[in-house]
UniProtKB/Swiss-Prot annotation:
Disulfide bridges in this chain: 1188-1200, 1194-1212, 1214-1223
Membrane topology according to the record: Multi-pass membrane protein
GO cellular component, one term: membrane
Described purpose of this protein according to its UniProt entry: Required for mucocyst secretion.
Name of protein: Cysteine repeat modular protein 2
FU repeats: 53-98, 104-151, 161-208, 210-263, 267-315, 317-362, 373-422, 427-492, 496-546, 554-602, 606-639, 640-686, 690-739, 760-814, 818-865
Transmembrane regions listed in the UniProt entry: 1599-1619, 1662-1682, 1704-1724, 1763-1783, 1796-1816
Amino acid sequence: MKFKKELINILALIFVLKKNIFAQSICPTGYQMTQGSCTAIQCPNGQYYDSNLGLCANCDQACSACNYYPTYCTQCQNGFYLYQNQCLTQCPQAQTYVSCSGSSCICQACDSSCTQCFGNKNTQCLACSVGFYYNQINSSCLKQCEDGYTQQIVNIGASQQLLCIPCDNNCRTCSQTNAQQCLTCKDNMYLNTATNQCVSTCPQLQYKINGICKICPTGCQTCYNTNPSNPSTVESCLSCVSGYFLDIENQLCVKNCVSGYVVDAATQRCLPCNATCKNCSDQTNQGCLQCQNGYSLTSGSPSSCQNNCPNGNYQNSSLCLSCNTACSECFGADNQQCTACKTGYYLYKTQCLVICPVGFYTFARQYADPLKQPICDYCPNEMEQCEQDKSNFDLIKPILCKRGYYLYNGTCVKTCPDQTYYQDEATRSCLPCVFPCQTCLSASVCLTCATYTPNGQVQGQTYIFAQITYNGPQGTVFQQNCVPACPKGFYQNSKNNSCQVCNQQCQTCQGPAQTDCITCQIYDSNNMLFKYNNQCYYTCPSSQNNPMYGDKTTQACLPCSQECSSCFNGNNKSCYSCMNGYFLEYLKPECKSFCASDGTYMNSSTNQCSLCGFGCSSCTNGTFNSCISCLNGYYLQQNYNVCYPCPQQCASCTDMNTCQSCNQGYFLYSQTNSCVQQCPLIGFYVDTTQQACIPCDASCLECYGGANNQCISCPKGSYLKTDGTCQQCSQCSSNNECLGPNITDCLNQPICKPGQYLYDGQCLTCFPYCSTCSGTTYDSCISCQTTTDYTLLFDVCKKKVSQTDTQCDIGFYYDSVNKQCYSCHQNCIQCFGKSSSQCTKCSSGYLLHLDITTCSSTCLDGYYQQDPSIPQCSPCLYNCINGCSSGYQFLLGLCFTQCPFGTTAQKENCSFNSKPSIQFAQNLGNSVNNNSQTISLQLLVYSKNLFSIKWRLFTGNTDISNGPIQSYIQNRFDYIVFPPKSLQSNTQYTIQASILDLANNCQNENDCMVQQTFQTMNAITKGNFNIEINSAYLQLTLIISGWLFNSVPDNISFDLYVKLTGNDYFFFDKGQNYQDGRFTYLIPNLSYDLQDNKAQFFLVIYNDFDVQIQQLLIALNLNLQQTTISIDEFLDSVYSKITTLQQIQSLSYQFYSQMQNLMSSQTTSQTIFNRHLFYQVYSSLKGVQIPCDSNINCSGNGKCLWSQDNYNEILCICNINYAGRYCEFQSYQLDIARQHLIALTDLISNIPLNKSSDLFFTIEVLLELTYFYSIFDEFTLNTLINVYFQVFNQLQRVQSNISDEKILFKISKLTSQLINLINEDQTLSYNDQQSLLMKTMNDFDSQINLYLQNFAKSFDDLKSQEQVQTSFQTDISNINLNLIYQNDLLDAFMSNNGASDGQQQTPIVFYGDQISYTFDITQFSPKSSLSTAVIKWNSNPFLSQSQYQAPFISCITELVIYSQQTEIQISTVSQIVEIAIPKILPTPILSVIRPFYQPYTCIYFDSVSQVYKQDGVQYLRENSTHVICGSEQISGNYGVIVNQEYIDPNLSLTVIWNATQQIYANDQQFINFINQLINSNNNNGTNENPQVSQSSFNPNLSLLYALLIYIIFITIFIVISIIRDRKDQETYIKESDSYWLVHPIYSLIFGPYSSFFPRLQRSINYAQLIINLFLYNAIFVLVYSLPSEQELQQNVGKRQIISIQISSTSVACSIVTYYLTICMVNLFKMKWYIKQKWLDFKQDKITTEIVEQVTKSLKIFHLMNYGLVFMLQAGMGIPIIILILSFNSQQNQFFFTSVFASFVIDNILDIIILISFCFIKIFSQSEKSKIILLFTLRGFYYPVYEFLDIEDKIKEYQQKGEVLPAEEANNQSDDEDIFEINDHMNTPKRIFKKNEEKIDKAQEEIQLNEFVNNLKTNQ
């Protein structure tokens, strides 16, 4: 029966393939035939078009849209991220960042400046592109480093890395070689060019210019530059050093004054001589040594110069001529030759000027000579501009100081006195720091902050110091200010009162840690972080018991809906997985209790609505034979529960022969229940509406409609009338026909006897059994002979049959409705209906088309006759319509350009070979890199009776395979796998494969054998390593030399791992290209972590394994470039060369792309042929009874059978009371095991797979379950297979966190048990993804099994560890290596970690300031090994029977250690050695089931005492086949025993299985754990105590009462709102929609916000309503749920009433209070401000007094308002106090006291918050805001803001006591918003007039004074 079901399923799928391929043969791939034309196939959402099957297949569950194959996603479901056409749960952190649009999120590539990035921005980099500098502080990549950083190029490996190194704190830019050497400085700092340091004040003999301290000229003590914009100009001296004198004219220091100048010893300046002197000894006229022209020197001492001419004249030769008009005395006619000036002029040198030049001042004091006029005297050295004090002529006051000096208190100083002032370069003065800075460097850079005392407070508050850096439009901006509160992203550090930056995940915070967040970052509406426990997460933390999601509204982590076990961000009902009892809808993130009838079923193993089988619309499970109903176009085969496709022309059908509706272009023919392209012409017409063939009226022969007047032709004996009806020939005899109604229209014919009929004027004999007829055929009878047993039915004389007789004669079929036999069509001799398309056997000369049950004389288009001797037509599948075109060979309905493997070309056909065929799929050649490569060789086999394949390996003539490696194959391929290091380098090998065929002359190995020779390459010879380190930047240099490559590609690279163990730091640099030389690595962010007098350890690991992998990838890429490669060769080249999951991931995209290219570029007939060949081999298998052998002996409890239904597999038929795949179990043991398997299956089915920990645990459980796979029933197997596929898919998503070797080992172990079970499901052969998965698993299984087979041959020498200690000073100068080899293959599979810390040497003891560093370079291959040789003793020779009662679980093993292929003896080791001891039998891993118990004890044999001991050896871990023990000493033989607490001490090895089951049976803790998981959804069961249920119900009821009362109050206030609204409209008095403020909720949402009701106050009021509504009920629940005594239980009713009363009263008072507050506001605005005249508006102008009155009024109003609120709410406590006194018991008083206390605290907190807000609001208002508030109270709202922009001018005129001019006010008017006073309403009103009419200019010129007067008038 099972075989029959599978065969039916196979035929159905083949039919679908034929149908689709037939359409594809006409239309291109991706198109289908529709109404005679090819149209593109459109698949529904969540599906893609599978070009191989020609169907729409489902996308992966994570994809919302895909192409090509299920996992090639183009759009992802919510909660997944699209990356390289894959949907991931999170983006790869090092390559992408998250970018969301709507609900679709994509992993976008990093910015072009980054090669790796992280976070939510594309500019948060980990590594930079070429030409960009990396800033480690802010993780950015820049073309040029920012200010404060210097650009450095560091050699790392063979490449160079560009870094931005931080400069010294005061530097803006610094040197590339030394970050402490500044190039430019920050603001208010100056570069000392001598030291390259930035200083705030330049040293002596230097001056400041453009941020630089420049050296003064020679002789200058202080100097400055007169033109800072041109630093190359000459400096000017201010003072001179000793021995030099200041030349004021040239601003230089000279040793001697020039002619006309004299030294002033007091000031060390060169002063000009008297104007009459050319040269002098002092400045007076008495010290002249030489006179000007026209003057003569007087005799005597002192001497002076006298004018030779009268005053106002000068001497010219012998004449006295008049001086210039400005000169009163002169020595020439020019204005430049004056010696004294007239009134109004000042003598400057020898020139008379009206104003003295810059640097001089008017010296007003008169000289002793009254005729002398004032002169222009020099300003003091530090002054650039100065003036003489009018009251004190001796005092010279500076106006502007020279550069480098600053004006302070009337003097020029070089530095300002203290930091409360700052030096302003613009004004060259000392300005006070701007509040709130207490000390500062500039107006915008504070150093410390001032304190301030808000009004009403006693103690002052200090402003917060904030240093903030942000990116502005002009670049990076640095602010150092004092702020009252820290901005977003910063928090206040109370220790130093400064703003410190928050954690980058926090938007606001209260500290620097991740757990100090107040709010979280928001990048955009779809990209934000969520808060949970004061920490921000990209994805909320969830557990199985507490699933959470990120709510985008509150930005918090909230619980998922109760039906979700995990959900997506944004909606608690958008589920990712479901709780037990709920199922995740297909392609919808919703959990439902039932699945919809949309082709899905409830999968309890995954809690999902999984897809039904092929064609099902509803089903019981996902298998093909579990359908309940079918999709359109399919029908249900009831006997097999399978949905089969309807015939191609049918849109719907009930079976293959009964169509219900037809596809476009076909019509339903009811006579045969089939769809035809053309209706019969006789008796039917086409109804296009119904798309069916409708019978004509009975009177018509042919017609075009169903009426009797729509005839086209008539039957014999009638004629066609003009009205379309048929009329009988009434005028003619019964045997005649007529042409019309007259007798003359009759056609006279002879009268025939009975049994004859008239034909062409002659009487001919009827068909036998006919009495009368119309022809000679069987279906032309009119009546039957009465003497025979026949009856007339549909013009045929049929033999009468009984109701129970269904057998008809040949040529007839049985009609079950009419219980009669009817004749077949004339083309058929056997049929099931009347039509020619209902034949099962054809008449002679006709060919049967089996799939469409049609007989025709020749094969129809699309069919061919495969065998000329068989009258049957088969459908063409590919490349043909009817036979093959020229150049093609025909085979099995396919056309080939070349006959496939296993066949031979014979003319135009391909025929199968009679003998088996065998060949290698590829030639290894001489490119095998044996040292690193896993070599896989594929064998192609065609054999109908294939039994096995044997492999041998030779070197020369030596067979080194150690016996043939036998493989039982399952299909036409086989593989041989050579693990790494199994072959020698530079060696020639011969691989030989032979097959055994039981029926075709392949009885021994040499009959059918192929072989090929290949050459291995030379090995890579490793060179020397050396390490150097630079202490400045923690820079490591790796020196590699002496490597040989020998025909290996040069582009070898390696990975570098650097580990700082003292700081737990790990640095990873991957993919460095190899070259001999130096590789430099800069370890980031560690230079400040090194400490003196403390050991620092580094671990540098060289990954030799990656070198080998890259060689494989190079070879693979070369293969991919060969476009002629076949699919099989391509698959083999991929799967034979990958060894880790990372390589699978990296090659996946390339693999699928190449696969698509191959599939589209070459014919797919090969693939179709392979499937046909597979089924041909399958159907030809014969069962053979064979004897059991050593490999399969059925445990001695059964017989061996070579089964035809299991692909040549040898199976066991067990004896009675035995069961299992190999009859290894007894029946009662089987029953016990099955009970636990049910629980375990449920366990793994309910484990979520969204976390790595859950995934690993599931793998462990699955691995254990596979040991018992032979006892699984069908349902359990299906569950395990589904879970297995889930696990495999999840592995691809989390594989970056998986240790590759361990997972590969587990996958292989799991696959080796499940592979045969999966193959039994034939549907998997037609699913490409599952076929691909199975092939991958086959390869894994083959690879690992052969690893283990060749394990003993792959041991390498144990390399002794060399360790050298090097100590040195802090400036590290040298380092050494420690070479550690990797463990063996088995240890890599079994160990928890790779290179453990235990392999590093212990810290070194040292003294002083020496620091020791140790570097280890660990290579991953070749691997050292400790091998254990298994000694199979019949009995334990070392163990007395009385020593250990517990049985041995393992073999007795002997530990043997080799070095240089020589056995060595080692007694002690420096660290624990791990020893893998094989088990006697594979057993489950008990540590998985009971993780907190140790199941085994490791022991060793002490040869001295001759007993086994446990000291010095310990149990570490186990798997199904080995136990790992750790030993501190190497000694003899080892074993493992089972602990007594696990099993019965008397248990023997023969019943080890029974012992294992007993463990399960006795493990009550495990059973309880299973039950808890199974019943996790049933924890809300019935409680035995009904009082608990009642008490939990009552508080909920009280809450409903409170809500009901609250709704009643809302209704009342809505009614009031409507009444108030109408009243306002009737009275024409409506002030700014004040009725909005009646109802609090309506007002909160829609009401205007004013100074009385800002948003914060409304939010507090609304929160108060919620608190009052639920607070008291919460207290009731809390108190009532305490352990209650009898009195508490008796007063439940009273407490309910009280609780409802409290809640209702609280809500009512809150709403009434709010309403009264609104009324007070309206009353206050309309009456108290106007009628009571609290403000005086009678003044002519707005003054500060008005503002003060507004402030005072607001204070009084708010105090009265909140005082009333407090009294109203405090009054609520009176009834509560009365109720307290009415109860006497202590419990009741405690209850009400708690309620009252909570009530009081609630109201006090409300009042404190509101009053505090009132004061803050008032006192924080600016003067402008207070003035605006004044107008707001008068009814003028927002336009006042624009009108009052003249605040500064008002303030200016108020200070002057003036009124603002009208034109100033007019300039501030608004063209669109005009204010006017409406006289008849007595209320100011705002008129909006926008673009409606041209506003009168007079209205635009309203003056401020008129506006104030209007306000006064309206009072």
